[in-house]
Amino acid sequence: MSLSCGDLANHNDRVVSLLNVCRKAPSFARTKALHALSITLCSVLLQPVYVCNNIISLYEKLGEVSLAGKVFDQMPERNKVSFNTIIKGYSKYGDVDKAWGVFSEMRYFGYLPNQSTVSGLLSCASLDVRAGTQLHGLSLKYGLFMADAFVGTCLLCLYGRLDLLEMAEQVFEDMPFKSLETWNHMMSLLGHRGFLKECMFFFRELVRMGASLTESSFLGVLKGVSCVKDLDISKQLHCSATKKGLDCEISVVNSLISAYGKCGNTHMAERMFQDAGSWDIVSWNAIICATAKSENPLKALKLFVSMPEHGFSPNQGTYVSVLGVSSLVQLLSCGRQIHGMLIKNGCETGIVLGNALIDFYAKCGNLEDSRLCFDYIRDKNIVCWNALLSGYANKDGPICLSLFLQMLQMGFRPTEYTFSTALKSCCVTELQQLHSVIVRMGYEDNDYVLSSLMRSYAKNQLMNDALLLLDWASGPTSVVPLNIVAGIYSRRGQYHESVKLISTLEQPDTVSWNIAIAACSRSDYHEEVIELFKHMLQSNIRPDKYTFVSILSLCSKLCDLTLGSSIHGLITKTDFSCADTFVCNVLIDMYGKCGSIRSVMKVFEETREKNLITWTALISCLGIHGYGQEALEKFKETLSLGFKPDRVSFISILTACRHGGMVKEGMGLFQKMKDYGVEPEMDHYRCAVDLLARNGYLKEAEHLIREMPFPADAPVWRTFLDGCNRFAEEQRNTLNVVSFQ
């Protein structure tokens, strides 16, 4: 029984209706069944174009591009929709050759490309510059670029993907119409490359124009903040997102957590995480990554352990972050457990995870396991080699260089990081060989490699050769190598030369000023240090924590409380005061040496993340000012919080006991040092001898000296004799009083 034309059309319409239903919940089995039904109703040669187009579209949506291609190839006739649909499919899944072939065929049959054609081709991830510029020209020729913002936005994304930022900016400027999506893509492009200033310019323009900002508007800028680590702008964007009601959107929350973490404000990152109404795996990865970079990286491991309680399973990004934490604190057993979890859960150890494992074992000093992980990876890339080389560079220089040569023989081209790593472990002969390889491969003018070469020559006591490298550089030398030279001068004690070189820089950066300030500080040019710091502020160069540490160290040396308090006020304005533990520790030390215990306690209480150094600095300050009992209580509190005291912690508490006359407590702690894995050194014995001698326990002090595992030095004997003299003087004074009575 044959179907009439009307019946056939009705059946085809029903097939298309069913295909549209299937599109809402795509299923390969249902699509194939409908495809078979359409062939049954009428042969392949009689299938209408609109039916075939729908089948191609659904196969493309399911990722079955080869089947979509077969349907396209068998079509008796095609229209522009047919060509655009299959071009989109091939482009989406990276088959640029087939996409371009269909595009050429389309033009051959006289079909002019439209926006859908060009945007489909531009979305292909593997499209090269030549093809991209050709499409750019065609879009201008056929008026597609000028029609609306869609094609221009696609071109902008393509140039961004190809890292052609200037071309992307030119496209943006030439576009007659710009959609919000265009602006968002441009900001994202700039943000991901760390151009925060330019990114913020576009963001402020959008705000000025009264545009309705979306999540994407914030994401690109926040990425730029993360790259540049600008805390002030992070806060501004946070406020702006709150005003727009976007601060609860999970993607914005995740980006803010990441930005605060990268800027070193772990407190705000944790607060954002806790205040979020809901989390996803990206939220967990962001907070783990943020806390991993904090003063207490073990928090990241605790968060990792708590993930299953909240219904989340770690993914590749999570494992990479926690392996980084394990390597940072050198917890070999913890990292091994994570490695075991990966194997148990059947996680495939690809390039990213493999590199993380290589790096973890290398940083923990287990080069054997690091090499095993390296050998296990099938398709190695240069990152794998860099991770392995970095491990051997810190432990075994000759093997590191042997691996470097092996890498070259296997055809891998070194990056600037590869050279920098290999240069760490060079002796003079190997350094000269590597230098020749660097020149041969054209890296001699690379600032990063040039700086590493200078450090290596300086490390091998070849200072003049290090300085000559600047003269040999063919291109204009940036501030980075010049900073290295200034640093070399400073370490050699040539402070005048260091400051003189910095003063010749047209645009010295924060590091330049820090080197000059540190150089003057080391040579005790106190007034010059203050003048340099003032000049730095007048030049609108933002001080960092190292600048403040240098100035605060000078305040400690001079016991200048007024200057120290002024610097503290400036630190508070730049938001370093509570967020940065390193700065807080130096502030505690400065106030302690200047005799302001009240300020010491205030800074200590305001410090958000206290580490062992924070507690040790407080104990030291309390001890030297006679608050022995309070120092002892703080030491006990340190232990109760899980901190493991080190050699400096014990010197601080023994000094506190010595000043407070607490012989029993002090000697009890001295005897327990080994329980905490700390072997008493000469400084500890000196404190213990002084504690005993100055309190009249001369026999015990002498016995302790005789029992020392190494010969006592002159200061130990001097301490003992001072105690003897003091005790003898006290006895004479007592006898005189008795005689007088």
Swiss-Prot record:
Pfam families from the UniProt entry: PPR, PPR_2
Q: What is this protein called?
A: Pentatricopeptide repeat-containing protein At3g58590
Q: Which PROSITE patterns match?
A: PPR
Mind telling me which InterPro entries this protein's record contains?
Answer: Pentatricopeptide_rpt (IPR002885), PPR_At4g14850-like_plant (IPR046960), TPR-like_helical_dom_sf (IPR011990)
Q: Name one GO biological process term.
A: RNA modification
Q: Which UniProt keywords apply?
A: Repeat
Q: Which NCBIfam families match?
A: PPR
PPR repeats located where? 48-78, 79-113, 114-146, 148-178, 179-213, 214-248, 249-279, 280-314, 315-349, 350-380, 381-414, 415-445, 446-481, 483-508, 509-543, 544-578, 580-610, 611-645, 646-680, 681-715
UniProt-recorded Gene Ontology molecular function terms:
RNA binding
State the family it belongs to. Answer: Belongs to the PPR family. P subfamily.
Q: Which Gene3D superfamilies match?
A: Tetratricopeptide repeat domain
